[in-house]
């Protein structure tokens, strides 16, 4: 049964499986010196910007800690929303790997703003204080909300004014692009993002992410940081070949568009159910809502999904590229019984 617990629970898109099968037919050089990786790098440069530096890694936490290590020193602090993945869901890995203090900022919707960030921009040049060095943001956010280009530009402009850099966790950036009708470049390079964690695992890939470095001053150290962070794959082609397929014929966009459409269908149906209340706008493929606890407990007997805030009876439902209309219709039918 397909669940609504997480897009990490979804399968692998057939086009990605085909790419993996093709990459498996013969031997190839290791550590990224293969034709599959060369082609994937070319695709990424075509998609984002020609002079970017792509680095394929195993997972999202690995991509985040590499990006943050690149742009900070241990005496820096990293600013993020209090719901940020690096603060809540990475077991302290960013702190361990960077040595930096992480400073969470309260937000109503998971989105940072210059107004929320500015009170944390102090202590510069004071040896007694951690020096603000980086801003971490997620697109889409952990609450399913989406930054517009203007909102991103406002944050990167503020950060660069203070000599800081901005890292975007793009685990679900495809869903943001699909929702806004924008290209990957329009939400990253054109907005002044310094380093991107380009995700695909939640949108049809089997595994792997890609750290994409846009800031010229960070590129020379990137490969060394990846190796030190235990994220250099010997059989790199099995990571990289997926991204070639992912970026071919806009598979990334088609998958995300479908996931978003299924989220809207689910949201529209839930709005007609008495007792359901949404706690965040549904802008991507994540839904946050409350309903009577008895109904939640009953649905958990059939479906697997997560509490987001158990004290408030708030749950999260997530659609995927492989969510079907009948999955939603069945869920709603059981809920209405």
Regions found by a protein language model. Give the residues of each.
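Conserved PLP-enzyme active-site core in the AAT-like
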Residues: 2-280, 284-290, 295-302, 309-313, ...
């Amino acid at each position: 049964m397909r669940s609504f617990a997480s897009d990490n629970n979804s399968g692998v898109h057939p086009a990605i499986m085909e790419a993996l099968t093709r990459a498996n037919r013969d031997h190839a050089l290791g550590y990224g010196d293969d034709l599959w990786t060369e082609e994937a790098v070319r695709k990424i440069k075509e998609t984002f910007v020609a002079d970017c530096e792509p680095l394929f890694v195993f997972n999202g936490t690995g991509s985040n800690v590499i990006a943050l290590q690149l742009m900070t020193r241990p005496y820096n602090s990293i600013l993020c929303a209090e719901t940020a993945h690096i603060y809540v869901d990475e077991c302290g890995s960013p702190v361990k790997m960077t040595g930096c203090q992480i400073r969470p900022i309260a937000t109503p919707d998971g989105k940072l703003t210059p107004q929320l960030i500015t009170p944390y921009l102090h202590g510069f040049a004071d040896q007694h204080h951690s020096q603000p060095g980086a801003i971490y943001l997620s697109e889409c956010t952990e609450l399913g909300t989406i930054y517009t280009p203007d909102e991103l530009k406002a944050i990167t402009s503020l950060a660069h004014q203070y000599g800081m850099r901005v890292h975007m966790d793009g685990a679900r950036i495809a869903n943001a692009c699909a929702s806004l009708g924008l290209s990957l470049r329009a939400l990253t390079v054109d907005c002044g993002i310094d380093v991107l964690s380009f995700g695909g695992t939640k949108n049809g890939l089997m595994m792997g992410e890609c750290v994409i470095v846009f800031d010229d001053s960070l590129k020379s150290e990137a490969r060394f940081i990846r190796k030190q962070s235990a994220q250099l794959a010997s059989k790199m082609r099995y990571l990289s070949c997926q991204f070639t397929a992912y970026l071919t014929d806009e598979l990334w966009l088609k998958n995300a568009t479908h996931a978003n459409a299924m989220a809207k269908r689910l949201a529209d149906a839930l709005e007609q159910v008495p007792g359901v209340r949404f706690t965040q706008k549904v802008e991507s493929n994540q839904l946050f809502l409350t309903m009577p606890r008895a109904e939640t407990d009953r649905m958990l007997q059939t479906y697997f999904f997560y509490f987001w805030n158990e004290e408030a009876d708030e749950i999260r439902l997530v659609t995927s590229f492989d969510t079907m209309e009948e999955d939603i219709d069945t869920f709603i039918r059981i809920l209405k019984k």
